[in-house]
């Protein structure tokens, strides 16, 4: 299950962070064979290679590095990395997949050192490095966590003492940017300190890691409690924990908050790790976790205030998981914007409400709540696909600015800096 992998990763990541080295901890150890067989295998051994394979009618079964893998012959032909099939400069496929015979079968298969060679009926030769096959096989991928994370409640996060990054260091050095992104990827939140309290400097900060995602709220948003938009956020009322833009088909990936001024009391920001809460549900009621990951719901935003007229609808389950490794990658939770439940059969509705209540109970546990007082100069970045946010009610005049960032661009920046994202 995905949480077992995450717990294992978290333990290794914490140990590595204590030693100042995180990159080496992202590789999983070899795992036991997923299949057993009594068939006759081709067997090749050397000082460095122990590899066996068997040719079936429509696929190759390969055992290497403690892994038993199965590869469809069409897949093996389609993924050929020869110069005529794959452009190594653009990293794009040149082969027309539709031209591959769906009944194709290699004439010969042989191993040379760590390379496995396939000769096809037309004489074309495909070769694969054994480690590449392990890395890209389904059996290999299902054992890997796509994005290593450290799940947290309030106590765990405070004990971690995750440092903020200085504004100038963030803007001017790759070291500062990498440190910030590493914290953000692991915890789903990160802070930048000593930012001049202006909308312009907040925008400059955001553009350092991503394109700003323009939405119905504009490019940069600036709001007070004047109810200038048809949203509870534009009031002084408390906001329960939620993720934003659940009414978009693809919710915004990252949001940025900067409190420019507050002349009053209250208004603390609430942060809850939705993945930590989901893990608790999976451990206590796995059938409810599964239901929340399969039942699609509509979320809706209807606005008719002044010149703003919008009707947005987004559809998806509360919990979104990768089907091959069951890893959670997105939580869509907003009781304010959830539309009429009309996508769920009668006999599932009550079970869904029960599962929703279980998740809500975990999200509302006081020990899972991290309260932060935002102030001028301190900018908060939130992974909107993971961490829920809210606020307590407040008095006085309060100005906030911020924006949404495109998730793909943030992850792109992280990968270019050598981070696992």
Curated annotation (Swiss-Prot):
Entry's localization field: Mitochondrion matrix
A Pfam family per the record: GBBH-like_N
UniProt KW Mitochondrion keyword: yes
EC numbers on record: 1.14.11.8
Catalysed reactions, semicolon-separated: N(6),N(6),N(6)-trimethyl-L-lysine + 2-oxoglutarate + O2 = (3S)-3-hydroxy-N(6),N(6),N(6)-trimethyl-L-lysine + succinate + CO2
GO biological process, one term: carnitine biosynthetic process
Cofactor binding comment, as recorded: Binds 1 Fe(2+) ion per subunit.
Organism superkingdom: Eukaryota
Residues noted as binding Fe cation in the record, renumbered to the chain: 242, 244, 389
Cofactor(s) the record lists: Fe(2+); L-ascorbate
Catalytic class of the enzyme: oxidoreductase
UniProt KW keywords: Acetylation, Carnitine biosynthesis, Dioxygenase, Iron, Metal-binding, Mitochondrion, Oxidoreductase, Transit peptide
GO molecular function terms listed in the Swiss-Prot or TrEMBL record: iron ion binding; oxidoreductase activity, acting on single donors with incorporation of molecular oxygen, incorporation of two atoms of oxygen; trimethyllysine dioxygenase activity
Feature: transit peptide: 1-15
Quaternary state and interactors: Homodimer.
Role of this protein: Converts trimethyllysine (TML) into hydroxytrimethyllysine (HTML).
Record-stated family: Belongs to the gamma-BBH/TMLD family.
Protein name per UniProt: Trimethyllysine dioxygenase, mitochondrial
Source organism: Mus musculus (Mouse)
Taxonomic placement: Eukaryota, Metazoa, Chordata, Craniata, Vertebrata
